[in-house]
Amino acid sequence: MIISAASDYRAAAQRILPPFLFHYMDGGAYSEYTLRRNVEDLSEVALRQRILKNMSDLSLETTLFNEKLSMPVALAPVGLCGMYARRGEVQAAKAADAHGIPFTLSTVSVCPIEEVAPAIKRPMWFQLYVLRDRGFMRNALERAKAAGCSTLVFTVDMPTPGARYRDAHSGMSGPNAAMRRYLQAVTHPQWAWDVGLNGRPHDLGNISAYLGKPTGLEDYIGWLGNNFDPSISWKDLEWIRDFWDGPMVIKGILDPEDARDAVRFGADGIVVSNHGGRQLDGVLSSARALPAIADAVKGDIAILADSGIRNGLDVVRMIALGADTVLLGRAFLYALATAGQAGVANLLNLIEKEMKVAMTLTGAKSISEITQDSLVQELSKAPAAALAPMAKGNAA
């Protein structure tokens, strides 16, 4: 298959992966309305073409948390990367490192912190969930610090897991799930050889190091399901702020008031995110939520954004809507599943080229010059208008 655009990796990954894995990464919560709107709303943001601007000295470089980035992109924390390619977290981290951008290791990674961190030169970021077992959280933070992780990404939009109906149909969960997964694996030989046989151990490395090695995937799912904490509040985060002395980013912000609370709390950054449409279906897409949040806290805190970003044009759109940097999730996972480290490296090259074209044709020589002026104003203002209170006479 010819890979000429980032979108080509999705089709390639679907051919290679057993259905339970493809649909686990590709699916969302409930009817997947927000999952679809993430992509569609962002694609409808119109760029403003400008010409004859002498763009010969264009630069994508930026700085975030005192780290130099080759472009305003980081790889998002994505669970189970090691089930999509052999030791997948290591391969993705190496690709990000070679491109000069951060890699974020998920709490629920297959490869543990101690395996991934030594494989790259720049410090990686680490993502942590709020869990009832504070002992695990402290253990994970201590290990992340010992491994030299520079930035903590704290995911707060998962006090309880979202209902992902696709998983029951695909075999990730539901009746006879283990047998269905086995049958799918043996009928996908490329994956079975690369990951099924040669990518072991298939456990959640950061958790097994704390609990010991559970007997199967269901044991991890059960432990995690029992440990998500719906009682969490800002007060519960204070001990983490005291314990972690590096940059701390709050992931899962969709409301301007929550963004202001993050500033008051003392966070260094936020991620405008709906968890890729995997938590609460029907919430705003990140593209629609971002402008109002930027209006509220831009300049007071670093603003990152994810959900729906599939190519370099989308990166430019998110920056113009108010983000300082974006996180890539599904986009890099499709590439990882298709061709491992080389796939992610090629994806990042494609995104960089697409960004350069978009910046050249919108007249933005640097990341700081990508602003609302880079957008067609009537359309770029539309997402923020979605947050305005509905007039009583227009209620439906």
From Swiss-Prot:
<dbReference type="GO" id="GO:0006089">
    <property type="term" value="P:lactate metabolic process"/>
</dbReference>
<feature type="binding site">
    <location>
        <position position="127"/>
    </location>
    <ligand>
        <name>FMN</name>
    </ligand>
</feature>
<protein>
    <recommendedName>
        <fullName>L-lactate dehydrogenase</fullName>
        <ecNumber>1.1.-.-</ecNumber>
    </recommendedName>
</protein>
<keyword id="KW-0285">Flavoprotein</keyword>
<keyword id="KW-0997">Cell inner membrane</keyword>
<feature type="binding site">
    <location>
        <position position="278"/>
    </location>
    <ligand>
        <name>substrate</name>
    </ligand>
</feature>
<feature type="domain" description="FMN hydroxy acid dehydrogenase">
    <location>
        <begin position="1"/>
        <end position="380"/>
    </location>
</feature>
<feature type="active site" description="Proton acceptor">
    <location>
        <position position="275"/>
    </location>
</feature>
<feature type="binding site">
    <location>
        <position position="155"/>
    </location>
    <ligand>
        <name>FMN</name>
    </ligand>
</feature>
<comment type="similarity">
    <text>Belongs to the FMN-dependent alpha-hydroxy acid dehydrogenase family.</text>
</comment>
<feature type="binding site">
    <location>
        <position position="164"/>
    </location>
    <ligand>
        <name>substrate</name>
    </ligand>
</feature>
<feature type="binding site">
    <location>
        <position position="24"/>
    </location>
    <ligand>
        <name>substrate</name>
    </ligand>
</feature>
<dbReference type="InterPro" id="IPR000262">
    <property type="entry name" value="FMN-dep_DH"/>
</dbReference>
<dbReference type="Pfam" id="PF01070">
    <property type="entry name" value="FMN_dh"/>
</dbReference>
<dbReference type="InterPro" id="IPR037396">
    <property type="entry name" value="FMN_HAD"/>
</dbReference>
<dbReference type="GO" id="GO:0004459">
    <property type="term" value="F:L-lactate dehydrogenase activity"/>
</dbReference>
<comment type="function">
    <text>Catalyzes the conversion of L-lactate to pyruvate. Is coupled to the respiratory chain.</text>
</comment>
<feature type="binding site">
    <location>
        <position position="106"/>
    </location>
    <ligand>
        <name>FMN</name>
    </ligand>
</feature>
<keyword id="KW-0560">Oxidoreductase</keyword>
<dbReference type="InterPro" id="IPR012133">
    <property type="entry name" value="Alpha-hydoxy_acid_DH_FMN"/>
</dbReference>
<dbReference type="InterPro" id="IPR013785">
    <property type="entry name" value="Aldolase_TIM"/>
</dbReference>
<dbReference type="GO" id="GO:0010181">
    <property type="term" value="F:FMN binding"/>
</dbReference>
<dbReference type="GO" id="GO:0005886">
    <property type="term" value="C:plasma membrane"/>
</dbReference>
<feature type="binding site">
    <location>
        <position position="251"/>
    </location>
    <ligand>
        <name>FMN</name>
    </ligand>
</feature>
<dbReference type="GO" id="GO:0009060">
    <property type="term" value="P:aerobic respiration"/>
</dbReference>
<dbReference type="InterPro" id="IPR020920">
    <property type="entry name" value="LldD"/>
</dbReference>
<keyword id="KW-0288">FMN</keyword>
<dbReference type="InterPro" id="IPR008259">
    <property type="entry name" value="FMN_hydac_DH_AS"/>
</dbReference>
<feature type="binding site">
    <location>
        <position position="129"/>
    </location>
    <ligand>
        <name>substrate</name>
    </ligand>
</feature>
<keyword id="KW-0472">Membrane</keyword>
<keyword id="KW-1003">Cell membrane</keyword>
<feature type="binding site">
    <location>
        <begin position="306"/>
        <end position="330"/>
    </location>
    <ligand>
        <name>FMN</name>
    </ligand>
</feature>
